[in-house]
Amino acid sequence: MNKQKLVRFINKYYLNGVVNSVILNSKSDLQELSARFISGDKTLLGDLTMDKWDFENSDIGIYNTEQLLKLLDVMDEDVKVSLSKSGDKSIAIKVSDTYSSVNYMLSDTSIINEPPQMKAIPDFELSINITPQFISKFIAGKNALVETDNFTVITDGDNTKLVIGYASINTNRVTIPVTTSKVSNIENVSFNANMFKEVLIANKECESATLKISSEGLSKITFKVDNFTSTYWLVAVSEVD
């Protein structure tokens, strides 16, 4: 197995520490590894699927993703992955390469928060085209404004822009004009810029995606690249002054 493929999967839900605990669902008949996840403050919800995954059926409880990534970092690129079990329950993952092996203790899946199912999904009035140039600009802009937590989507029904650090008063800010495939004149809506930056970093190899915005305070973005499909929902933050 290629270690980097597994690490890429993990980083798409881990988001540099936004989500640390998750249940991985391995399905041998579909050759698929998937996960549904939620941030600690419940403002980010996501689901992730990787195909061409040749592994046994199992529910794998990962309580401390940071520790798992550190252990995987010890390994060479070509690895063998196996599960240690007690009855039907998976209790550890063993990863080995030509020279060494690591053992990661799994968590009981019952102590990991189960993300809620999305029920009443609002209409998305705005669809923003996400390009590699936008991804690099947003990441650079957020890195320049380290202490700024939010970005705001502003549109007049014709022109749309994302502003990191927006406020009604004069502030340090980064403004990124964007193109849209669907647009309406909605009120300004703001989201967590730190989380969105990590989503973009984890999926920066994607050539195109669409960020959908609802005036009811929800955004959705889906990335499809290589063997990965990832969807993230962000809940709007309190109105920016």
Residue ranges and their predicted role:
Residues 109-128:
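Long, charge-dense
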